[in-house]
Amino acid sequence: KRPLFQLGQILSTPGVLEHLDHHGVNAQPFLERHITGDFGDVCADDAKENLFAIEQGFRVLSAYTIAERKVWCITEADRSCTTLLFPEEY
């Protein structure tokens, strides 16, 4: 699958970084899913909103369960950066 948008700079909160490191998980496959339209654990309406956001240049949010924790992947509207964070860190 081809990328649907640019990630920009890839950032992570310290909590997610520690979680990924502790469980030996590479974030790359999740980032690839995010930019190719596999938005993970979001409802159908949110997935449709993401496709609209990609077309119109709005924020894109995916949600993945990584080592039993929900992790959000958010790309800003201006595509300057994509951040991995826990929902409670938003």
Where are the regions that the model predicts?
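Compact soluble domain cores
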Residues: 1-60
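Short, compact, well-ordered microdomains
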Residues: 55-90
